[in-house]
UniProtKB/Swiss-Prot annotation:
The active site is at 7, 66, 138. The RuvA-RuvB-RuvC complex processes Holliday junction (HJ) DNA during genetic recombination and DNA repair. Endonuclease that resolves HJ intermediates. Cleaves cruciform DNA by making single-stranded nicks across the HJ at symmetrical positions within the homologous arms, yielding a 5'-phosphate and a 3'-hydroxyl group; requires a central core of homology in the junction. The consensus cleavage sequence is 5'-(A/T)TT(C/G)-3'. Cleavage occurs on the 3'-side of the TT dinucleotide at the point of strand exchange. It comes from the Bacteria. It comes from Burkholderia multivorans (strain ATCC 17616 / 249). Pfam families: RuvC. The gene is ruvC. Its EC number is 3.1.21.10. Mg(2+) 1 binds at residues 7, 138. It is found in: Cytoplasm. Binds 2 Mg(2+) ion per subunit. It catalyses: Endonucleolytic cleavage at a junction such as a reciprocal single-stranded crossover between two homologous DNA duplexes (Holliday junction). This is Crossover junction endodeoxyribonuclease RuvC. NCBIfam families: ruvC. One of its GO terms (cellular component) is cytoplasm.
């Protein structure tokens, strides 16, 4: 099964594509869609077109996207929601089912701690996918969303579906910390 993860943003939208076979995770692609400094409609169109292109190029079976959190600034929240909507439209227009996860669910599923830092997310994604280098933070979040979805949103604290994947990499959890 191929999963496309999306980390929505108005300026930068991260994407990550993984293949899943049983408990095996395989990296396919990741990167970002950057929008031009232009009016809102142009930026949203760029996100929609970019996500639509990813769906055509990588032919995922499912998609997952991060849910919007309510920011202190309501205008920022509305703009992020619109960017997220453009990405979802690109996914749905490609016929994909779309799952949604909060940042807390994502961090807990990947790192085992809901308030994990960007650096901790990048490190765990790098280890889980056996990458030679760390992806950028937006791409790492998108890959994390795809991994979270691959394991049904299970958390490391319950050792849902990630325990076998960690064991294959020679890793395990000890008192909430990753050890090798």
């Amino acid at each position: 099964m191929r999963i496309l993860g999306i980390d929505p943003g108005l300026r930068v939208t991260g994407f990550g594509v993984i293949d899943v076979s049983g408990h095996q995770l395989a990296y396919v692609a990741s990167g970002v869609i950057r929008t031009p400094t232009a009016d809102l409609a142009t930026r949203l169109g760029t996100i929609f077109a970019g996500v639509s292109t990813l769906v055509r190029e990588h032919a995922p079976d499912q998609a997952a996207i991060e849910k919007v959190f309510v920011n202190v600034n309501p205008q920022s929240t509305l703009l992020l929601g619109q960017a997220r909507g453009a990405a979802i439209c690109g996914l749905v227009s490609g016929g994909l089912p779309v799952a949604e996860y909060t940042a807390l669910q994502l961090k807990q599923a990947i790192v085992g701690y809901g308030r994990a830092t960007k650096a901790q997310m990048q490190e765990m994604v790098t280890r889980l996918l056996s990458l030679s280098g760390q992806p950028g933070s937006d791409a790492a979040d998108a890959l994390g969303i795809a991994i979270c979805h691959a394991h049904g949103g299970n958390t490391l604290s319950t050792l849902g579906g990630l325990a076998p994947a960690l064991a294959q990499k020679g890793l395990r959890l000890r008192r909430g910390r990753l050890v090798g």
